[in-house]
A protein has these predicted regions:
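Single conserved hydrophobic/aromatic residue that forms the stacking wall/gate
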Residues: 1-7, 11
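A short loop-to-beta-strand scaffold at the N-terminal edge of the catalytic core in hydrolase folds
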Residues: 9-21
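Short substrate-entry loop that stabilizes the transition state in hydrolases
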Residues: 23-28, 33-72
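Cell-envelope and extracellular/periplasmic
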Residues: 35-38, 139, 188-192, 220
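Alpha/beta-hydrolase active-site loop
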Residues: 78-99
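Primarily recognizes the serine-hydrolase "nucleophile elbow" in alpha/beta-hydrolase
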Residues: 97, 103-152
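The feature captures the conserved acid-bearing segment of alpha/beta-hydrolase catalytic domains
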Residues: 158-205
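C-terminal catalytic histidine-bearing segment of alpha/beta-hydrolase fold enzymes
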Residues: 192-244
């Protein structure tokens, strides 16, 4: 458990998946995995039961926080929901202070699915001093086409009356904060996913800014089967980044 002043609960439950190396106090890199809307801290280990085996094989610590339905923002409408601060500051400091990590952005990555894909890119782009690599699986990287969905209006206010806030809280409008080389990026989305078009738009915006990134589309939808496959690509990408 992590004591948090940024999130409404005094304690936020997290799930830590530790490789044997870390249990033996040998310092390891860390991948933060963010769940989607309706999920919780256990979502990733339920979706990918092989996560402990992957941790051992790669020598990576996986940290799976409970982000509720926050979209990982510091909500301008809900002062109790400061999940950007929680994930990028409090949780990272707690993890580095209590586990055998390599406390450096070059050994720290973040990824997630759906809401968590948005959250991972949002967190990394805005805190490139904290994370060296980031990924998104089926991420809601432009929220504006979906103004009535997934309780986003609880965090940002109703879209019609708060368009400027919605513009400011969408990933595709954060790209001015990075230049090529700031982050190692991997983005993927299924060909049958309702987020496919916003992910293609993000890809094109990154190309226009000449920001290197891996962009993958594969057959599949917005499903656990797709993400169970996606995580393998992301862990491979992050492992290569950590070993540079």
């Amino acid at each position: 458990r992590v004591r948090s002043s940024a999130a409404s609960d005094v304690y936020k439950r997290q799930v830590y998946v530790l490789p044997d190396k870390a249990i033996g106090k040998q310092a390891c890199p860390v991948v933060y995995l963010l769940h989607g809307y309706g999920g919780n801290a256990r979502s990733w280990v339920q979706l990918k039961p092989e996560l402990p085996q992957m941790a051992d094989e790669k020598g990576i610590i996986f940290v799976c926080p409970d982000g509720k339905n926050s979209w990982y923002w510091d909500s301008p409408e809900n002062p109790a929901y400061r999940y950007e601060t929680f994930v990028t500051s409090e949780l990272v400091k707690y993890t580095d202070g209590n586990y055998a990590t390599i406390p450096d952005r070059k050994a720290r990555a973040i990824s997630g699915l759906s809401m968590g894909g948005h959250g991972a890119l949002w967190s990394a782009i805005r805190h490139k001093d904290v994370f060296g690599a980031a990924g998104s699986m089926s991420g809601g990287v432009d929220i504006r086409p979906f103004p009535q969905n997934w309780e986003m209006n609880k965090q940002l206010g109703e879209f019609a009356a708060n368009k400027a806030s919605w513009d400011a809280h969408t990933v595709v409008n954060q790209l001015d904060k990075i230049v090529n080389g700031d982050l190692a990026l991997i983005i993927d989305c299924g060909e049958a996913d309702f987020f496919l078009e916003v992910n293609k738009d993000l890809h094109n915006r990154l190309l226009a800014r000449k920001i290197d990134h891996d962009f993958i589309t594969r057959p599949g939808g917005h499903t656990g089967t797709y993400w169970n496959n996606s995580i393998d690509y992301h862990v491979l990408f992050f492992d290569k980044f950590f070993k540079k």
